[in-house]
């Protein structure tokens, strides 16, 4: 934790980590390869500002704030990921897209303040939390064909959103609070 001069670490055999294990290790640069990681601790790589790519081929569930504020992170390789936890990628300004076809659950704030995300591919997401894409103003459309449940504020703060394809919304009898709060570009709700 806060080993700001630590430049690299061999994670090739690591399956589990404690909380804050590499929090603020600013010396980490380039790619993190975690071929066996299955149980990451909370805040694991938070504020590791120079990580550019992450590979975790067997990871199914992320941890809270796992890569939050990893501002250079641009490439994510997690081919079996099922769950993105609270604020896992908050303020990851290097991300320009979300391409996670295996993900089924995205929890509150997961991609909030990722200001350069422009495209989203989450075809199998069944559940999303609030403010998942808050302050992601470059996202103009979103498609969530498999969505089954969401919380209030699910699309809140998507200021560039102009259209959406979310079949579940057409079946609602009650609209949750803050569903489209601050979606300033949205002109119609079907």
Give the label of every model feature segment:
Residues 18-23, 41-46, 63-68, 85-90, ...:
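Consensus positions within tandem repeat domains that build extended binding/scaffold surfaces
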Residues 3-16, 27-39, 49-61, 71-83, ...:
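Structural signature of tandem-repeat unit edges
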